[in-house]
Amino acid sequence: MAFAVASQPDQARPAESELASSSAAAQYITDSCLSDGPVGRVGLEVEAHCYDPADPHRRPTWGEINDVLKSLPAMPGGSVVTVEPGGAVELSGPPIDGVVPAIEAMTTDQTTLRNAFAAAGLGLVLLGADPLRPAKRINPGARYRAMEQFFKASRTGVAGAAMMTSTASVQVNLDAGPAAGWADRVRLAHALGPTLVAIAANSPLLGGAFSGWRSTRQRVWSQLDSARCGPVLTASGDDPGTDWARYALKAPVMLVHSPEAVPVLHYLPFADWADGRELLGGRRPTRHDLEYHLTTLFPPVRPRQWLEIRYLDSVPDAIWPAVVFTLVSLLDDPVAADIAAEAVEPVATAWDIAARVGLGDQRLYTAANRLVAVAAERVPAGLGEAMQRLVTAVERARCPADDFSDQVIENGIRATVTWLARGDP
């Protein structure tokens, strides 16, 4: 979490009253999903796959990674370091006023983290999907174990395992902004998605083979239940609070606490639990159950009082600052937002096309060039080189996946991953 840390369930937590109905749950969601205020703060989260450069087929163990974490100094930019189910390492930065300071803080923390892992003989690689290793969970946490069981029971075990243990992203967290502009802002955050997916696609392989998709990460997400992982809004959504409430209540319950995370292995929409059509543990849900349920929903744009933008692949250091700057500029600058909304309208729902062919689609190519041009007009000098690199790539209809694919074709998967894990120039 970049803007706040949710309280964790505890056996000593005081008892709460049950929700009266799904209508009461909907009202709570609508009232609390976004926070009224100015825009300007930016929180970044960057995930990187962890490799052993001496044997990139080997997945470093939970113990090895934790030994590195125990020796870490405090991150100078304020990031919190966590480990994903498959051993990917995540830096979660605090909310910072302005996109450039947020990028600078994250870059500093990345250097600190990378140096610590290198000292332990391990490397961190920024790719949207693990190109080499099969899916495998190493994080023993109860939540991840329960999620794994849930996905298997819902017949999405393969995609669920890949999502949890083989994908990585750059997440951008932004203020919701003034309430009067929520509908337009949330709508634009969704509408930008396909074009930004095409620009930042960086996962052409998964588990040792080319997938046929520029963003295999996005493909994996699309194979999961759309009631949990699909977009909340259509391009014309006018009431983000109501839309989020409808989405959340329709989504099946994944986990409950008893007191640890326990999977719900049959289909039960949260609304049915709240209305008493079926009880879990002999009761209806409490507000805390509802809050926890919301953390098990993974749409590409998720309201958490702020906005979580979750649809970007993890991309190389040379380009992610420009991608982040582009996204933030298009949402936080009113003039840029108006231009962007018009530019992406023809491709506002083209998620699968963007993930499969990237900028090879002419409509996405046109929209992408307009977006990066608008951002380039606003870029400060310190990001000029990264922005020019992004503009040039988009003009050539290339995304990071194309560069990675070329390296793999020339050198092989193992050699390419080893090179990246070592951080060789």
Enumerate the language-model features and the residues they cover.
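Terminal catalytic/cofactor-binding subdomain
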Residues: M1-G160, S166, A201, Q305, ...
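Loop-rich catalytic cores of soluble enzymes, especially ATP-dependent carboxylate-amine ligases
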Residues: V125, A129-G157, A162-R302
